[in-house]
């Protein structure tokens, strides 16, 4: 058997030596370990991304719930403010009506009092005028004693009727 040492043979020997060197230096194990480490890193990153996504969804749901609660509370506050404004308006209207009614009653009372005082003044003036007229008529027609008697009686009657 004859061996030919041609280029193919040396290429084959170089390949075998290279593969032996690679196996001796444990390159396939290092590659497998490196790929496993990379796979673990990717798996951990995916798990972290999933956890962050779930946390973000949870926070989003919580913020949406809080927003709805805030909107409901704002609507409640607005409704309460509207009710209070209506109550204050009604109360102010009632107080204004009461004030106007009281002022009207007071004005009517003052008018009635003025009417009564005017009637008293007119009666007093009429009595004074009647007394003066009676004095004049009696002064011309009666003597002093009769005049004095009539005057006293008339004044007494006027006093009793006015009081």
From Swiss-Prot:
InterPro entries: ATP_synth_b/b'su_bac/chlpt, ATP_synthase_B_chain. PANTHER family: ATP SYNTHASE SUBUNIT B, ATP SYNTHASE SUBUNIT B', CHLOROPLASTIC. It comes from Rhizobium leguminosarum bv. trifolii (strain WSM2304). F-type ATPases have 2 components, F(1) - the catalytic core - and F(0) - the membrane proton channel. F(1) has five subunits: alpha(3), beta(3), gamma(1), delta(1), epsilon(1). F(0) has three main subunits: a(1), b(2) and c(10-14). The alpha and beta chains form an alternating ring which encloses part of the gamma chain. F(1) is attached to F(0) by a central stalk formed by the gamma and epsilon chains, while a peripheral stalk is formed by the delta and b chains. Belongs to the ATPase B chain family. GO terms for cellular component: plasma membrane; proton-transporting ATP synthase complex. It is a single-pass membrane protein. GO terms for molecular function: proton-transporting ATP synthase activity, rotational mechanism; proton-transporting ATPase activity, rotational mechanism. It comes from the Bacteria. Its main location: membrane. Pfam families: ATP-synt_B. It is found in: Cell inner membrane. The chain crosses the membrane at residues 5-25. F(1)F(0) ATP synthase produces ATP from ADP in the presence of a proton or sodium gradient. F-type ATPases consist of two structural domains, F(1) containing the extramembraneous catalytic core and F(0) containing the membrane proton channel, linked together by a central stalk and a peripheral stalk. During catalysis, ATP synthesis in the catalytic domain of F(1) is coupled via a rotary mechanism of the central stalk subunits to proton translocation. This is ATP synthase subunit b 1. Keywords: ATP synthesis, Cell inner membrane, Cell membrane, CF(0), Hydrogen ion transport, Ion transport, Membrane, Transmembrane, Transmembrane helix, Transport.
